[in-house]
Amino acid sequence: EKKPSGTTSFDPLPAAQKIDELLNAHLKSENLKPNPLISDGLFLRRIYLSIIGRIPTILEANNFLNSNSKNKHSELIQKLLSNDAGYTAHHYQFWADLLRIPTNVDYTLYYREWIKSQIRNNTPYDDLVHQLVSGHGLIFDNPAAAYYLRDAGMALDNMSNSVRIFLGTRLECAQCHDHPFDKWTQMDYFKMAAYTYDFDVRMGVAKNSNRQRVYQDFGKRKNAAYKKEAGFEDFPHIHDESKIDEWLGQPYAPGYLERNNLTKEQFREAAVRAIAARKKVEEFDNPVSQSVNMLYGHISNVQVKHHDDKPLKLPHDYQYDNGAPEEIVKPGTMFGPEIPHLEDQTERKNAYANWLTSPENPRFTRVIVNRLWKRAFGHGIFEPVDNLTDRTEINQPALLRFLENLMQELDYDIRDFQNVLFHTELFRREMHLEDHSPGMKFHFAGPLLKRMSAEQIWDSITTLILPNVDTYAPNRKRTQERIARTKAIYQS
């Protein structure tokens, strides 16, 4: 069982000192010197922005700057990591961007609150990812299933995104052909996608449901009123009066008028009557239609399920010798241990999640430590963080190996891992202020200068205005009410 967040039992200093030793040895080998240490004031601002995403209040600043404790830097780090509200709010932005969580649909309310609870409870990273990629069922019962709702109707794209996010590997090109710049083949792509391709999302309700019959009845009523007032069963559909002359200007209009013995003026009068009749029905039905949409809109995305009759097939134009067009693809891993063939979809998905998050997976740990390193210091040990290939040049391999081992020794405890990074001398060094071009080696004499995020700027401004800014959540009650309403609507 994981220790509670904000624990003081973990000593980050030995690992932090080892990181500094590796960095200093590398700098020495390059005839470089580390940047000078920053002042307490700069450290104060940097650590607040890094851990809880805002500047300190005047009281918080004075408490730190006036402290005579020899360990005040470490004590402040521990205090901020123990600030569940501030830590969760700031780190949620990181995960929301990474997981591409939308904010404009109701189903994500459950998902967003669940992600925040995982951050707050310090769920191990491997456990969090396992829950996400193995998730299925109703989001009320298993909010992690909403990870697949993000790519509703795009099962192939979901696999590309998962591999990029969690393994730092770009497979998009291999969806259509063998990757031109990496070793992945189109068959590799489809074998990976076969693990999760059979998932689907319950988008609303069935075609023969009461809801659909209501919409069908609305449509029939409008069409009947339109045709009755026009006086012709085959009277053309014209949306509004401004389109009448446009229709009369079409090459097929004279033939229609002649067949029905109509002049242009008679046609125009019939169209005006028909449009008015349809609008009258719409005015009566629209409030009901809107009420139905309001009711069902809340539950249009609430479930991830498996299909028994949805095997993944190669494209109709598959051109390589290792398969035939429209051949059914069996799942297979792109690297690392093979997964035994499993017929049961849930077991197969769990086995895929086990493979993805395994310490034996050569990229799972490497990618997350590099992402967190870049978040702390402005530049990854390798770049880009989500385009790792066999040809990727890693400037400090010993440092990367140490960080991977550290993450595994910490059982993927994200707070403890960041605790180590924030205790390094590197974190307290002056930033690298010069332009750094992509592709150039970065030696970490100090962190790379980076701009504040929009959220950091906003939260820093509100810090100057609001008391208890970390716990200020005026919309929380409304959010919880919306969640409860959505669940009640579905269960009804």
For each feature predicted by the language model, list its residue ranges.
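Conserved AdoMet
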Residues: A89-Q93
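Primarily short, surface-exposed interaction patches in extracytoplasmic proteins
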Residues: D11-R45, S50-I51, I55-G86, R100-Q491
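Extended acidic/polar, glycine-enriched regions
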Residues: E1-S5
